[in-house]
From Swiss-Prot:
Odorant receptor. This is Putative olfactory receptor 1F2. GO terms for cellular component: plasma membrane. One of its GO terms (biological process) is signal transduction. Belongs to the G-protein coupled receptor 1 family. It comes from Homo sapiens (Human). The chain crosses the membrane at residues 26-49, 58-78, 100-119, 139-157, 196-218, 236-258, 272-291. Keywords: Cell membrane, Disulfide bond, G-protein coupled receptor, Membrane, Olfaction, Receptor, Sensory transduction, Transducer, Transmembrane, Transmembrane helix. It is a multi-pass membrane protein. CDD domains: 7tmA_OR1_7-like.
Length: 312
């Protein structure tokens, strides 16, 4: 069969979401709007945290890092928009591997940061008298740096595994960006090792932080339920509300598509999950964290006021 003959593939075709011209125009406007909202929202949060000294705390340090990661996540959108404007669907082989590398790295970073933020909430709620002594700046910096190192190592491993594969004449990717699973489907090589590594990564890099996060919230729940007053319990839970909403949004998006082997994947389900993961989630996170947080809203007002009066 022709598929069994490896050829030198220099580029791939990203089919995107729709081939209908009218739908493409609507999707272009949608993605452009979401991208601008993501960049603006996350930049405002980063600026607000850096300007307002009251927000120079571990919780907001982790939040500013997550906003940075979310902004980086949305960089897959400009490629889609550029392809629409240029009337092309191509992406180079090296560009595809690079895109896959950054998506894997940033997804892992989001996962690690959510676990780190859960630990921060655990210390704040369950060990309030020791919070300042435990959550020192050096520890916070170490947790974030360690997360970047592990995420980078895992993404690099993924990329090297994909780079060693051979690809056939069929270079069409039914996706909005280069992801591991659709690339495995196109490969003419034996993908068993890559599939095993992906499942191992899912177990170690995804489930382990999730279990740490789950343990933190189990402790938080036990402590909060022992608070005698309803008002006290609500106040304690409210400190975790925004983070818990982001956790549910994140894991609700990634659990389904990334825990199946390549043979059981549906392109439509993968694309829908990818849109939620790389477009919807990054724009929702700043909204979730700012709508119910008086400190963030106050800092955002300060940022807007400073920028407005500086222009005047």
């Amino acid at each position: 069969m022709e598929r069994d003959k490896p050829v030198s593939v220099s580029e791939f075709l990203l089919l995107g979401l729709s081939r209908q011209p009218q739908q493409q125009h609507l999707l272009f406007v949608f993605f452009l709007s979401m991208y601008l909202a993501t960049v603006l929202g996350n930049l405002l949060i980063i600026l607000a945290i850096s300007i307002d000294s009251r927000l120079h705390t571990p919780m907001y340090f982790f939040l500013s890092n997550m906003s940075f990661v979310d902004n980086c996540f949305s960089t897959t959108v400009p490629k889609m928009l550029a392809n629409h404007i240029l009337r092309t669907q191509t992406i180079s082989f090296s560009g595809c591997l690079m895109q896959m590398y950054f998506i894997s790295e940033l997804a892992d970073m989001d996962n690690f940061l959510l676990a780190v933020m859960a630990y921060d909430r655990f210390v704040a709620v369950c060990r309030p008298l020791h919070y300042t002594a435990k959550m020192i700046h050096q520890l916070c910096a170490l947790l974030v740096t360690g997360s970047w190192v592990v995420a980078n190592s895992n993404a690099l491993l993924h990329t090297l595994l994909m780079a060693r594969l051979s690809f056939c004449a069929d270079n069409t990717i039914p996706h909005i960006f280069c992801d591991v699973t659709p690339l495995l489907k196109l490969s003419c090589s034996d993908t068993h090792l890559s599939e095993v590594m992906i499942l191992t990564e899912a177990a170690l890099v995804t489930i382990t932080p999730f279990l740490c996060l789950l343990a933190s919230y189990m402790h938080i729940t036990c402590v909060v339920l022992r608070v005698p007053s309803t008002k006290g319990r609500w106040k304690a839970f409210s400190t975790c509300g925004s983070h818990l909403a982001v956790v549910l949004l994140f894991y609700g998006t990634i659990m389904s598509p990334y825990f199946r082997t390549s043979s059981s994947h549906s392109a439509q389900r993968d694309i829908a999950a990818a849109v939620r993961f790389t477009v919807v989630t990054p724009v929702m996170n700043p909204l979730i964290y700012s709508l119910r947080n008086k400190d963030i809203k106050g800092a955002l007002v300060k940022v807007v006021a400073v920028k407005f009066f500086s222009v005047q």
